[in-house]
């Protein structure tokens, strides 16, 4: 029988399981330390203290290693741990947080005594004195100098980390992040000064060393250093001679071996530049060559060690340049490029774990703060501070950001920096990566090291995950608000004002820095939006900071803001509009990109606003892609058929066309559609409009008396020509057509033709009526005899004409002929008739081919518009659309009788057939294909950006950047887009010349 012992006789010592120890050897290690030999209260408290270490197993293992080290004085340490709560908290916390500092303690076992008693952080001067004393002792034995300095540096890190972490184990004071970061910077200064002294000794011996100032940059310069970080420096010498450079180089080597990596990459010309420059050389560089990012870097500059007078001269000379950098001509362009570069630095697979460069991370805060300092620092000296936390406070105090926002952003920034410190302490390695989401053990360790405790709903790891989500989201939201909320408060109604709001001049400076070329107009638009009465103004005030931030990344934020104002005013009565933008960030972000890129789409959206709701994502992907162009075409024809009045029928057709154009153009701008899909969708809707218009006019013109009452005197088919026939229409394309008719039984040809011509002319007139929508021009000039020929012919008339009189250009035009609307059977018969002309059994005559070559030469010489650049005209320029299409058509004329696959109206499909048949080498065909696709994308992009048909690419500037973005290139890469266009078309032109034999 088992007898339960009374409670007073049960062991008081907690088991390893209750302590949270999971290492299989934990119990053995406890016994090795003798901690299970006594069950008094002191040992109970000791064990529970160990359990509170961030990683108690790691702490226990380090203690065992320390106990096994002869010089550690374990008996003294073991006894002290039982009675000295502060020592216990510091030692357990640091051993449970940092494997590297545990290794240091084992290597320097007596260093635990640094954590004993009333420990405080030394001042900057006291640290410098410690390192100076160490150097004085070490120089007597130069071989050991850096070893001693390295040990001293690690000892001081140990003390700081222990004080920083102690509160996780015992009730010890919490060190503020700013104190930790400043002390790390002081420690770096002392270490650099020591390395400089040793370097001077190594290089100069007993000679007087050269005057050299070391300027700390980055986080060290701002006194906000990490536990593990490169220390960025710039060297300033009285003379930039060999000896001074050797001292600087030796200092970098010694410091990098003993303390931390020293990086001089921020110096003028970077790693390609001289390591040491004089003050005068620095001044000359920054006056002539420095980029905006280099002035931004100077915000953190601080004379750290070395010659103080030289350092002061350097700062006095260069800092005034920092505060006028925002007036530089290329400031805005470079700032926008820097913003985008920050976002592109992070590999996609770790973006969610990046605490520094990820979305809502540290760099978001730092970049935004530095930009606001550059913009407003010229007129406000209170912003001339180096650290991020101090700058946030100054920006809030000055009204450049809301004070509550400044406080929230500071809290988020300090939280993220705390996590960064804990991650780096673990192995004293430079890292910014959070643990993998499914690495429960690593997440739990980080939470405990950051002094995060369970909250009743989540364990520590769960609380950390929630807090990270909250802080990242808050930073992302405040990042946008940071730039724009104070602007709105400076122009908004009384209820939005802050006590010391931004002046209008400051608001204009800030908008200009964010990419707005007309900041005064932008402020007027913003004012009109937020000063609306009632709910709309309030919602706009909430929405605009985020919307304006997204829009600032578009190529034309000025045009985008105007379009947004017009759209908002046009949809003022639509309650869903602002709600959608508020509740669906993906919709709002995509809309801002479209509005800030295109002049074509905003007008369409004002009359087809429901397309905006399709900017979001559905279960299967983007909702803009859920619509089938063929279904749209059927719906358009059906909608028009419900009206007996042709005008109303076409109005109904225009409505559906407008919506489809808005959908296709939006999806195109957002990178969701390939250019070939765009062309097919545009062709589909054009064909549907032609069908609807033809049906409406036939209904309106049916005879109301006589034997043909209620019956059409003729069947009519519409033959698509050019890009319409090839299903390759762009946004600015006309519809090239021919009309063919066939008399109804009992109707003579002349009457049938007159009636069909009247219908065709009415179709052209009705569709061509000026409208707010993109034009619907129907061009019939490719018919036999061109403008001089009859608008409509019978099938027999066409056959007779082509058999007897067809000119080479008319044969060439027929290569693109395709039945698109009207009587399908008649259309097919027309194509069979046309095949005899365009694909004759024995091939086209040599005379016709020579004539085509002659016409092409004349087109090249004469048809380019006056003043056009032949290198960048997308239609008629070198290697443009006409070049590629004429080349394909010449090969069709020469070989279609031998290669049935060339009986095709599509340029791209014919190119595939040409390559398959070996008529042109495959690599050359690919050059033609790439040129056609490139020119088509560019031509479509021109219409999307400018809002009207045009073929000429603009020169370098904002509009070219917009065209590049609309064509699928990243923002600010207009130059690369143009270079690519020129390269692709130049190579294609060589193939064109080869085929044409010129």
From Swiss-Prot:
Transferase is among the record's keywords: yes
SUPFAM superfamilies, alphabetized: Nucleotidyltransferase, Nucleotidyltransferase substrate binding subunit/domain
Region Adenylyl transferase, residue ranges: 492-998
Entry-linked Gene3D superfamilies: Beta Polymerase, domain 2, Nucleotidyltransferases domain 2
Entry's Gene Ontology molecular function annotations: [glutamate-ammonia-ligase] adenylyltransferase activity; [glutamine synthetase]-adenylyl-L-tyrosine phosphorylase activity; ATP binding; magnesium ion binding
Claim: Calcium is one of the keywords in the record: no
Stretches the record annotates as Adenylyl removase: 1-487
Keywords attached to this entry: ATP-binding, Magnesium, Multifunctional enzyme, Nucleotide-binding, Nucleotidyltransferase, Transferase
Superkingdom of origin: Bacteria
Record-listed E.C. numbers: 2.7.7.89, 2.7.7.42
Pfam family, one: GlnD_UR_UTase
Catalytic activity as recorded in UniProt: [glutamine synthetase]-O(4)-(5'-adenylyl)-L-tyrosine + phosphate = [glutamine synthetase]-L-tyrosine + ADP; [glutamine synthetase]-L-tyrosine + ATP = [glutamine synthetase]-O(4)-(5'-adenylyl)-L-tyrosine + diphosphate
GO biological process, one term: regulation of glutamine family amino acid metabolic process
Cofactors demanded by this protein: Mg(2+)
GO CC, one annotated term: cytosol
Function according to Swiss-Prot or TrEMBL: Involved in the regulation of glutamine synthetase GlnA, a key enzyme in the process to assimilate ammonia. When cellular nitrogen levels are high, the C-terminal adenylyl transferase (AT) inactivates GlnA by covalent transfer of an adenylyl group from ATP to specific tyrosine residue of GlnA, thus reducing its activity. Conversely, when nitrogen levels are low, the N-terminal adenylyl removase (AR) activates GlnA by removing the adenylyl group by phosphorolysis, increasing its activity.
PANTHER family in the cross-refs: BIFUNCTIONAL GLUTAMINE SYNTHETASE ADENYLYLTRANSFERASE_ADENYLYL-REMOVING ENZYME, GLUTAMINE SYNTHETASE ADENYLYLTRANSFERASE
Family indicated by similarity: Belongs to the GlnE family.
Name of this protein: Bifunctional glutamine synthetase adenylyltransferase/adenylyl-removing enzyme
Organism per entry: Mycobacterium avium (strain 104)
């Amino acid at each position: 029988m088992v007898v339960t012992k009374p409670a007073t006789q049960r062991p008081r010592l907690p088991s390893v399981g209750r302590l949270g120890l999971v290492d299989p050897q934990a119990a053995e290690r406890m016994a090795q330390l003798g901690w299970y030999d006594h069950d008094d209260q002191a040992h109970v408290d000791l064990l529970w203290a160990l359990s509170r270490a961030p990683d108690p197993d790691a702490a226990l293992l380090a203690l065992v290693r320390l106990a096994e080290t002869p010089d550690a004085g374990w008996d003294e340490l073991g006894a002290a741990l039982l009675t000295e709560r502060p020592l216990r908290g510091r030692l357990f916390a640091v051993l449970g947080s940092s494997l590297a500092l545990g290794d240091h303690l084992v290597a320097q076992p007596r260093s635990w005594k640094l954590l004993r008693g009333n420990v405080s952080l030394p001042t900057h001067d006291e640290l410098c004195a410690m390192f100076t004393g160490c150097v004085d002792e070490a120089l007597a034995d130069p071989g050991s100098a850096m070893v001693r300095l390295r040990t001293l540096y690690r000892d001081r890190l140990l003390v700081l980390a222990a004080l920083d972490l102690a509160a996780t184990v015992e009730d010890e004071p919490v060190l503020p992040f700013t104190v930790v970061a400043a002390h790390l910077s002081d420690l770096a200064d002392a270490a650099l000064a020591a390395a400089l002294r040793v370097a001077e000794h190594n290089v100069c011996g007993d000679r007087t060393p050269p005057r050299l100032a070391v300027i700390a940059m980055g986080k060290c310069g701002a006194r906000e250093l990490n536990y593990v970080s490169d220390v960025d420096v710039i060297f300033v010498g009285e003379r930039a001679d060999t000896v001074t450079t050797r001292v600087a180089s030796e200092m970098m080597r010694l410091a990098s071996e003993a303390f931390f990596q020293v990086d001089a990459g921020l110096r003028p010309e970077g790693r390609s530049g001289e390591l040491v420059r004089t003050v005068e050389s620095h001044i000359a560089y920054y006056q002539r060559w420095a980029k905006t990012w280099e002035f931004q870097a100077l915000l953190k500059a601080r004379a750290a060690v070395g010659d103080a007078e030289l350092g002061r001269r350097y700062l006095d000379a260069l800092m005034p340049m920092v505060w006028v950098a925002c007036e530089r001509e290329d400031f805005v362009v470079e700032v926008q490029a820097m913003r985008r570069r920050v976002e592109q630095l992070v590999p996609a697979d770790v973006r969610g774990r990046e605490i520094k460069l990820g979305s809502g991370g540290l760099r978001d805060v730092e970049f935004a703060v530095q930009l606001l300092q550059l913009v407003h620092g010229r007129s406000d000296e209170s912003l001339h501070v180096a650290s991020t936390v101090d700058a946030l406070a100054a920006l809030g105090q000055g009204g450049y950001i809301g004070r509550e926002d400044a406080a929230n952003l500071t809290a988020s920034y300090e939280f993220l920096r705390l996590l960064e410190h804990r991650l780096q302490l673990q192995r004293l390695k430079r890292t910014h990566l959070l643990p993998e989401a499914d690495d429960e053990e690593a997440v739990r360790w980080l939470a405990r090291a950051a002094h995060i405790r369970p909250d009743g709903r989540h364990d520590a790891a769960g609380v950390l995950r929630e807090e990270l989500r909250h802080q990242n989201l808050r930073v992302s939201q405040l990042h946008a608000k940071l730039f724009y909320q104070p602007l709105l408060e400076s122009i908004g109604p009384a209820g939005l004002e802050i006590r010391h709001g931004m002046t209008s001049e400051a608001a204009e400076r800030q908008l200009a820095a964010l990419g707005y070329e007309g900041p005064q107009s932008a402020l007027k638009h913003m004012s009109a939006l937020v000063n609306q009465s009632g709910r709309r103004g309030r919602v706009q005030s909430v929405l605009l900071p985020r919307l304006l931030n997204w829009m600032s990344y578009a190529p034309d934020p000025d045009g985008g803001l105007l379009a947004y104002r017009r759209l908002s005013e046009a949809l003022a009565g639509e309650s869903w509009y602002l709600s959608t933008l508020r509740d669906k960030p993906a919709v709002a972000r995509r809309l801002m990109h479209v509005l800030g890129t295109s002049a074509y789409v905003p007008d369409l959206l004002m009359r087809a606003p429901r397309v905006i709701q399709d900017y979001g994502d559905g279960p299967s992907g983007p909702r803009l892609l859920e619509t089938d162009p063929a279904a749209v075409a059927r719906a358009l024809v059906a909608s028009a058929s419900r009206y007996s009045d042709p005008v109303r029928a076409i109005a109904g057709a225009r409505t559906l066309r407008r919506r489809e154009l808005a959908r296709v153009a939006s999806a195109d701008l957002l990178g969701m559609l390939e250019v070939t899909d765009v062309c097919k969708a545009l062709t589909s809707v054009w064909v549907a409009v032609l069908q609807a218009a033809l049906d409406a006019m036939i209904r309106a013109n049916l005879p109301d008396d006589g034997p043909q009452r209620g019956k059409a005197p003729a069947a009519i088919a519409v033959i698509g020509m050019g890009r319409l026939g090839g299903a390759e229409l762009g946004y600015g394309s006309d519809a090239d057509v021919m009309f063919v008719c066939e008399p109804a039984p009992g109707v003579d040809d002349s009457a049938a033709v007159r009636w069909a011509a009247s219908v065709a002319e009415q179709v052209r007139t009705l569709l061509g009526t000026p409208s707010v929508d993109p034009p619907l021009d129907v061009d019939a000039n490719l018919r036999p005899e061109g403008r001089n020929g009859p608008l409509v012919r019978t099938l027999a008339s066409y056959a007779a004409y082509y058999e007897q009189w067809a000119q080479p250009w008319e044969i060439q035009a027929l290569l693109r002929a395709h039945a698109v609307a009207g009587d399908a059977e008649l259309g097919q018969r027309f194509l069979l008739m046309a095949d005899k002309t365009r694909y004759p059994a024995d091939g086209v005559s040599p005379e016709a081919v020579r004539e085509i070559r002659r016409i092409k030469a004349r087109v090249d010489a004469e048809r380019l518009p006056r003043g056009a650049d032949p290198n960048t005209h997308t239609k008629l320029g070198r290697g443009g659309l006409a070049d590629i299409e004429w080349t394909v058509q010449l090969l069709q004329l020469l070989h279609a009788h031998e290669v049935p696959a060339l009986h095709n109206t599509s340029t791209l499909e014919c190119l595939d057939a040409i390559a398959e048949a070996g008529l042109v080498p495959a690599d050359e065909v690919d050059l033609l294909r790439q040129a056609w696709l490139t020119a088509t994308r560019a031509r479509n992009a021109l219409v999307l950006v400018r809002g009207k048909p045009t073929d000429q690419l603009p020169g370098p500037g904002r509009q070219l950047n917009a065209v590049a973005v609309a064509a699928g290139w990243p923002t600010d890469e207009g130059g690369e887009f143009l270079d690519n266009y020129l390269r692709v078309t130049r190579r294609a032109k060589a193939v064109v010349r080869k085929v044409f034999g010129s």
